[in-house]
Amino acid sequence: MLLVIDVGNTNTVLGIYHEGELEYHWRIETSRHKTEDEFGMLLRSLFDYVGLMFDQIEGIIISSVVPPIMFSLERMCIKYFQIEPQIVGPGMKTGLNIKYDNPKEVGADRIVNAVAAIHLYGSPLIVVDFGTATTYCYINERKEYMGGAIAPGITISTEALYSRAAKLPRIEIARPDHIVGKSTVSAMQSGILYGYVGQVEGIVKRMKWQSKKNPKVIATGGLASLIADESDCIDIVDPFLTLKGLELIYERNRVESV
């Protein structure tokens, strides 16, 4: 079995693969201050819940956009699983040709998403990831990672509105009954949701225009389904795209090292 770990700024997603299939997955809050033992005990409780043992894990791969957490995570893998984890980063075989000015600047999550999307859906592609930041990645017809756009995530924007405007409440991100809100809450929901739909459609439209292609648009992340329901520009929602990419990269590097 393979343990895959995707560390984001807000949430960490863990998955267990067995014979190429995702059997279990969990989403937990990302904590920069947990020790290796706290991570170990957390995973112990998750494993116990589904009847797994640590010694069933044969490999571990981690992608992270939160460097401070990595020391504790790596130590946890060694102490509790007796496994040196693969870390997505420079020097790892991904099969992705990155055309960024400085390829080392591309976040591990964006690389992993691109690898999975190319493998599953072909190219050209636009991959939209609704996370703490909303990222847009363009992959051309030669399967080259050309770059993209990074915008504040929908949750960050909502929290900023709440914290900076004294009379505006904290709200649930949800589809309002009408685009013309009849209350403060519904008006905020309308502005936030449809403002983000407009952002997605605008950036995707401009990427397509600049590329002079008609790339398939793949969305992932916690709010992907909500946005996709309101827009025709998203072709496929794949909530486990990042975990799939981690499994692919692990297998490529495992085969390479054999």
Swiss-Prot record:
It is found in: Cytoplasm. One of its GO terms (cellular component) is cytoplasm. It catalyses: (R)-pantothenate + ATP = (R)-4'-phosphopantothenate + ADP + H(+). The keyword ATP-binding applies. The active site is at D109 (proton acceptor). ATP binds at D6, V7, G8, N9, T10, N11, T12, V13, T132. Homodimer. This is Type III pantothenate kinase. It comes from Bacillus licheniformis (strain ATCC 14580 / DSM 13 / JCM 2505 / CCUG 7422 / NBRC 12200 / NCIMB 9375 / NCTC 10341 / NRRL NRS-1264 / Gibson 46).
